[in-house]
Curated annotation (Swiss-Prot):
Belongs to the class I-like SAM-binding methyltransferase superfamily. rRNA adenine N(6)-methyltransferase family. RsmA subfamily. S-adenosyl-L-methionine binds at H9, L11, G34, E55, D78, N93. Its EC number is 2.1.1.-. Pfam families: RrnaAD. GO terms for molecular function: RNA binding; rRNA (adenine-N6,N6-)-dimethyltransferase activity. Specifically dimethylates two adjacent adenosines in the loop of a conserved hairpin near the 3'-end of 16S rRNA in the 30S particle. May play a critical role in biogenesis of 30S subunits. PROSITE patterns: RRNA_A_DIMETH, SAM_RNA_A_N6_MT. This is Probable ribosomal RNA small subunit methyltransferase A. Keywords: Cytoplasm, Methyltransferase, RNA-binding, rRNA processing, S-adenosyl-L-methionine, Transferase. It is found in: Cytoplasm. The keyword Methyltransferase applies. The gene is rsmA. It is an enzyme of class 2 (transferase). One of its GO terms (cellular component) is cytoplasm.
Amino acid sequence: MKRRRLAQHFLRDPSVAEYIAGLVPSGLDVIEVGPGAGALTIPLAKRSKTVYAIEIDKALAERLRGIAPPNVVIIVGDALEVEWPRADFFVSNVPYSITSPLLFKLIRHRLPAVLTIQREVAERLVARPGSEDYGRLTVAVQCFYDVEILRVLPPYVFDPPPKVYSAVVRLMPKAPCVDNFDEFEKFSAWLFSARRKTLRRLKLADSTKRVYQLTLEELVELFKRHKA
């Protein structure tokens, strides 16, 4: 089954699957979202204590049960809605249509992660202040993670091949920049809805600096002053 409605493209290249699995430390409890036919699940299971595979498609989940080793626990449901089990690491070939909400849920769990996502989204995650890619998602993720693009993947390693390139990204938790993510995220969303306006125009500071030019540290300082 090709889940075009979810914009998911299944990994088909065994060498890429082995590469991604090899990025996960051995002996951990791992959550995998969107296992599909199990191309990544099987090599993950070989090096993990437990793999919790969250699959929304019942038919695919049943097919996976037929090939998965005993240390794979299959959870049928929507990864955005089901409660995630306690785990040490997170892995996903992320369905394009849920990339942002899945990232926001991941932030709340603060798990280290290896994700395969659209290259343009990956570039947003590592974007620097002042660039066109720098925005709300950048700030939210960089507040809690060190982000690194490890590898760019061509369309032909997926089935069906997407129209764009993908990227393997590693997210490693760091000391959070704020204590209250939900409040900070709402503030960032409001700010970046006016990304080209100056702080003076927004009556936040006597500065001609524009929102998209602010560093993470400057955004945090504005947030703290706004809360006070």
